[in-house]
Amino acid sequence: MALVEGNNGVSGGAVSFSEEQEALVLKSWAIMKKDSANIGLRFFLKIFEVAPSASQMFSFLRNSDVPLEKNPKLKTHAMSVFVMTCEAAAQLRKAGKVTVRDTTLKRLGATHFKYGVGDAHFEVTRFALLETIKEAVPVDMWSPAMKSAWSEAYNQLVAAIKQEMKPAE
């Protein structure tokens, strides 16, 4: 798997992600990784619960009679997005920047640009991600510090994607 790196919008490209934040992300990701397919699907179902019209941004969901929770293409996409997001968060401090496997930030940016993804979509996705993680980890593990760590990691990923949001070359 190729590891693609990108500047995340922080001047100089260096990211500020503390050891404590990294530890919280790694600890929770270690628990969620085993069930990433189901958690990823719950993540996307939560996005569509908050913003039902968001499902129309996905060609494989438009005009589909298959219930969202049973749609095999959504299951595959949801898992890959969730894993990519969590892996990028887990690598953030060590790499010092956003790293993404199996794709490029340029391609992610172009895709999000093409489908008209805007700040409101990223905000809904942040909310859904944090709620999904909160529900996926043991109750006594979730804390304001863990929420903050995941939120910061997500912010860095979004900044890196936004930097590449332009038409595909």
From Swiss-Prot:
Heme b binds at residues 59, 73, 77, 107, 111-112. It comes from Oryza sativa subsp. japonica. GO terms for molecular function: heme binding; metal ion binding; oxidoreductase activity; oxygen binding. It is an enzyme of class 1 (oxidoreductase). Its cofactor is heme b. Homodimer. Residues 16-166 form the Globin domain. It holds the Pfam family Globin. One of its GO terms (cellular component) is nucleus. The record marks 147 as: Homodimerization. It is found in: Cytoplasm; Nucleus. A motif (Homodimerization) lies at residues 49-53, 119-131. Induction: By flooding and etiolating but not by oxidative, nitrosative or hormonal stresses. Strong, rapid and transient induction by nitrate NO(3)(-), nitrite NO(2)(-) and nitric oxide (NO) donors, such as S-nitroso-N-acetylpenicillamine (SNAP) and sodium nitroprusside (SNP). Its EC number is 1.7.2.-. This is Anaerobic nitrite reductase NSHB2. Phytoglobin that reduces nitrite to nitric oxide under anoxic conditions (e.g. during flooding or in waterlogged soil). May not function as an oxygen storage or transport protein. Has an unusually high affinity for O(2) through an hexacoordinate heme iron because of a very low dissociation constant. Promotes tolerance to low potassium K(+) conditions.
